[in-house]
C-alpha cells in the first residue's frame, strides 16, 4: 500500500480521542486511508498485539487515587508513560474502577485477579487498555488502611478529577469520640498536612533506625570538621537530631494549619474538645512516580518526527 499524506492535525485529533501513541495513530490513519472512525476501530483491534511490546517501556507518569469506604481506605498508583495519558478520560475511569475494587480486594495480588464489571480481571483490563491507549500501563502499588473505630481522612493533591491526582494521602484516627464530623475534619486536615510535609513516620520510635544513624553520622562528621570539642559535639549532634525529628516525624512537625503548634499538640487540644483519646493509627502517602526512573521526551519533536517520517 502506498503511504497517503496524513496531516499532523489528524494524528493529533486521533490521539486526543483514543489516547493511543502518536505512531500508532499515524499508522491507523494510513491503514484506513484517513478514515477517522475506521482508524479508531483499527487501534482497538490491533492494539492487543502490541501490548506486550509496550510492557517493557518506562511508565513513571499516571495517577494516584485515594478511596475511603467507612473505616477502610486504600491508596493506589497506576502508571502510564506520559502525562498526556493521565488526562485521558478512559485512563481516569480505569484508575477509578481499580480503586473501587481495591477497597474490597485488600491486597494487590488479589486485586489483580479481581473480576471487573466487564468480566475481565483487573490485570486483563489493564492489558486491554494498553492496547487502546497505546502506552505501557502498570498497577504499581496499593496500600490499605483499616481502623475499628474512628475516622479516615483523605486528600488528593493536584487533582485532575475528584480523588485522582499526583499525591494521595490517607490518615486514620483511632478514637471513640462521639462527634464524628469533627474527628473526620481533623483527619482531613492532617491528611493535607501529610501531603505537604511528607513525614517519614508517626513518631520517633517508628522512624527507620538506619536513617537516624545515617543522619547522626553526618551531623557528627560535620561538627568534627568545625573543630568543636568532643563534649560540645555530642550536644550539637543531639540538638541536630531533635531538629531532624521535628522535620520528618509527623507528631513533632509544626502543623500546617496552626504553625505555632505541633501535630501532637493539635491532637491533644482535639482530645480535650471531643472528650476522647485520639491516636494516629496509620498514614499512607503516595507521590506519583517516586523511586521510578523518568525519561524526558519532547512532545513537539515527537510530533514532527512521526508526521514527517
UniProtKB/Swiss-Prot annotation:
Residues 82-85 are annotated as: Involved in Mg(2+) ion dislocation from EF-Tu. HAMAP family: EF_Ts. It comes from Rickettsia peacockii (strain Rustic). GO terms for cellular component: cytoplasm. The keyword Cytoplasm applies. This is Elongation factor Ts. Keywords: Cytoplasm, Elongation factor, Protein biosynthesis. InterPro entries: EF-Ts_dimer_sf, Transl_elong_EFTs/EF1B, Transl_elong_EFTs/EF1B_dimer, Transl_elong_Ts_CS, UBA-like_sf. Pfam families: EF_TS. GO terms for molecular function: translation elongation factor activity. Associates with the EF-Tu.GDP complex and induces the exchange of GDP to GTP. It remains bound to the aminoacyl-tRNA.EF-Tu.GTP complex up to the GTP hydrolysis stage on the ribosome. Belongs to the EF-Ts family.
